[in-house]
């Protein structure tokens, strides 16, 4: 009778241990899955909007990164050179050691020079790219009458001008954002547009953002032509 009781207790302990292991594994998988979903959602909301309109800022950041990298490399070269010279002093005047240390210093200098050349070339290319982006922004603002404003909550406001022939500075605006599912949402049109739901559905199907802006401008233009 005592042996049977011990067997039952052992079976119960084994079952509880297996249940505990399955529970921990399942909880870990759920936490990991939820973290991946949140990570994907944040990435989709970020990448979908600023790929085109932050090119200029990214180029400037890269120039600063190259500059900081060169400064950091200079410090590292100086530290390594100092350490190498200290090693040479400890080892005395042995010619072979001095030659090896000199070669190491020379290689470090050549490496630094190559990085400087790459950084200068990238800075020059980035400056040209920034000029092109500035020209494009000027074209949008002055000729096409489109201004883009960043709002809170990862929203962008598109302000169209040069629509009303009687008042070219009159703004026609619309707010565009991404919802939790990564779909476009078009809201806050001023003045209101009756066809906004149709435009929103179409851009969700085609993902053609340029066509959405073109349709919004056409609708605002048609609305502006009715004003007397």
Curated annotation (Swiss-Prot):
GO CC annotations on file: kinetochore; Ndc80 complex; nucleus
Segments forming a coiled coil: 61-144
Localization per Swiss-Prot or TrEMBL: Nucleus; Chromosome, Centromere, Kinetochore
Gene Ontology annotations of biological process type: cell division; chromosome segregation; mitotic spindle organization
Domain of life per record: Eukaryota
Keywords of this entry: Cell cycle, Cell division, Centromere, Chromosome, Coiled coil, Kinetochore, Mitosis, Nucleus
Function statement: Acts as a component of the essential kinetochore-associated NDC80 complex, which is required for chromosome segregation and spindle checkpoint activity. Required for kinetochore integrity and the organization of stable microtubule binding sites in the outer plate of the kinetochore. The NDC80 complex synergistically enhances the affinity of the SKA1 complex for microtubules and may allow the NDC80 complex to track depolymerizing microtubules.
Subunit structure: Component of the NDC80 complex, which is composed of ndc80, cdca1, spbc24 and spbc25. The NDC80 complex interacts with mis12 and zwint.
Family statement drawn from the similarity comment of this UniProt entry: Belongs to the SPC25 family.
UniProt-recorded name of the protein: Kinetochore protein Spc25
Organism whose genome encodes this protein: Xenopus tropicalis (Western clawed frog)
Organismal lineage: Eukaryota, Metazoa, Chordata, Craniata, Vertebrata
